[in-house]
């Protein structure tokens, strides 16, 4: 009985820890989503609505915390931590992960990191820097509360330590605890997605850690790494951040690829079309995704040759990504086109939204076009189509598909589940599709006010956000 009471801090079973990851992801995600509802409530009409003129920095603080929570505390614990912990040992034929106690510690670090990030909102001005924490704003003692930046950075360092421990755990399990005769070549796409994600985390997280530690030392110890007055370079920080920041996008979406591949293959009783090419495509995405970080920085005064190189490599990523979409559709086309399960419907919705988000990414990857669209709502629409719709739908797909394993019972495949799927999908599309048009009208992101001419599109976005909220309320 005592152990049941303290199961969170005493249990080392990989399935139990995976479920805890999913619950944490769900709870943290609700908090982050409600912050986005506040943003859309503010933006439903021009002029300031619910945020007072003298407290407009609250808007900056809300979108900063929203971004950090949804990336580091919703999608990563859900897809990488939850799905990975629960199913990686099973897919490898192992009874347990290599280091169960380290696995337990990495889980316990997640709520600690979350609380630290939330504490930043209690500071006088909050840490309204955006989730990218660009200097000189984040290193200025004049405009923000230094303690808010401190707790955000420390929270992210704690979260990074947890992610690195999980990655080492997964890789060690795959390399040394596989079932006899199960070679790397015959591992499933889902397993390979977690292997590649773990490798990317191990290669890129140390760079982010170095960058934010330099940021902290600039803030408190006068090191002047990023102060151009004393021969520092704020662009150096952008390189360090985005060297992690762009692979992070693929770290978030690769486990989703594994889940969707598994769901489509199992629901339709078909082996995945081009199974080995799917694994190769994920490897290509990981390699190319690690050398395109400068496409976030086209407006920082790059040389033409540099922009040409990063434009080419960015657009090149569409080839392996297109391979994956093609193979998913070919697997689906070899069936009788039926929707056998709610997870089948969700996986098809994922393919549609991910394809659309990837198409807008090809447009943004062009160095000439991005100069016009940089920091507009077009960028927000692009990455929310891939992450907010794509990765989150993949998370719901996994919960729907593995519900019997996770919860010990199966929900009835009744009308309300289909209605929820459609309501949620229509809500998020209605939220983010009009943002492309706002971007073409050059509405800048991170600004709480805008011209009256843009009222129509913004009102549609806010209606979509409300629909999504109602959709989540009926999610079982």
Swiss-Prot record:
It is found in: Mitochondrion inner membrane. Pfam families: COX1. Its cofactor is heme; Cu cation. It catalyses: 4 Fe(II)-[cytochrome c] + O2 + 8 H(+)(in) = 4 Fe(III)-[cytochrome c] + 2 H2O + 4 H(+)(out). Its EC number is 7.1.1.9. Binds 2 heme A groups non-covalently per subunit. GO terms for cellular component: mitochondrial inner membrane. Fe(II)-heme a binds at residues 66, 384. GO terms for biological process: electron transport coupled proton transport; mitochondrial electron transport, cytochrome c to oxygen. Ca(2+) binds at residues 42, 448. Pathway: Energy metabolism; oxidative phosphorylation. Mg(2+) binds at residues 374-375. Component of the cytochrome c oxidase (complex IV, CIV), a multisubunit enzyme composed of a catalytic core of 3 subunits and several supernumerary subunits. The complex exists as a monomer or a dimer and forms supercomplexes (SCs) in the inner mitochondrial membrane with ubiquinol-cytochrome c oxidoreductase (cytochrome b-c1 complex, complex III, CIII). This is Cytochrome c oxidase subunit 1. It comes from Plasmodium chabaudi.
């Amino acid at each position: 009985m005592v152990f049941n009471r303290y199961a969170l801090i005493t249990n080392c079973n990989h399935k139990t820890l995976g479920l805890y990851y999913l619950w944490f992801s769900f709870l943290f995600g609700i908090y982050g989503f409600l912050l986005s509802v506040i943003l859309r409530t503010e933006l439903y009409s021009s002029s300031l609505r619910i945020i007072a003129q003298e407290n407009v920095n609250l808007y900056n603080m809300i979108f900063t915390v929203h971004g950090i929570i949804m990336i580091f505390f919703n999608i990563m614990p859900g897809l990488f931590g939850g799905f990975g912990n629960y199913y990686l040992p099973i897919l490898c034929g192992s009874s347990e992960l290599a280091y169960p106690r380290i696995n337990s510690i990495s889980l316990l670090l997640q709520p600690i990191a979350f609380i630290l990030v939330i504490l930043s909102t209690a500071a006088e001005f909050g840490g309204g820097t955006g989730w990218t924490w660009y200097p000189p704003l984040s290193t200025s003692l004049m405009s923000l509360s230094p303690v808010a930046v401190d707790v955000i950075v420390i929270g992210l360092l704690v979260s990074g330590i947890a992610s690195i421990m999980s990655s080492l755990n997964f890789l060690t399990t795959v390399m040394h605890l596989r079932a006899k005769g199960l070679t790397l070549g015959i591992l499933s796409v889902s397993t390979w997605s977690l292997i590649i994600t773990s490798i990317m985390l191990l290669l890129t997280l140390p760079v982010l850690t170095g960058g934010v530690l330099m940021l902290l030392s600039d803030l408190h110890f006068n090191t002047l790494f990023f102060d151009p007055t004393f021969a520092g370079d704020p662009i150096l920080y952008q390189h360090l951040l985005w060297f992690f920041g762009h692979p992070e996008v693929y770290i978030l979406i690769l486990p989703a690829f594994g889940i969707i591949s598994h769901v489509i293959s199992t629901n339709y009783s078909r082996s995945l079309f081009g199974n080995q090419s799917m694994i190769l495509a994920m490897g290509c995405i990981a390699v190319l995704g690690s050398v395109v970080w400068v496409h976030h920085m086209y407006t920082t005064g790059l040389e033409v040759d540099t922009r040409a190189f990063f434009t080419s490599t960015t657009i090149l990523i569409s080839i392996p990504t297109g391979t994956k979409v093609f193979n998913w559709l070919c697997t689906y086309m070899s069936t009788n086109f039926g929707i056998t399960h709610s997870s089948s419907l969700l996986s098809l919705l994922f393919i549609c939204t991910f394809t659309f988000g990837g198409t807008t990414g090809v447009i943004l990857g062009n160095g000439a076009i991005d100069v016009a669209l940089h920091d507009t709502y077009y960028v927000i629409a692009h990455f929310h189509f891939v992450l907010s719709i794509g990765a989150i739908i993949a998370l719901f797909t996994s919960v729907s598909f593995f519900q019997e394993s996770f919860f010990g019972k199966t929900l009835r495949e009744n009308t309300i589940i289909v209605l929820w799927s459609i309501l949620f999908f229509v809500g998020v599309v209605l939220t983010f599709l009009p943002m492309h048009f706002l971007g073409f009208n050059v509405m800048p992101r991170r600004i709480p006010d805008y011209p009256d001419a843009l009222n129509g599109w913004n009102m549609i976005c806010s209606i979509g956000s409300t629909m999504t909220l109602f959709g989540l309320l009926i999610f079982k």
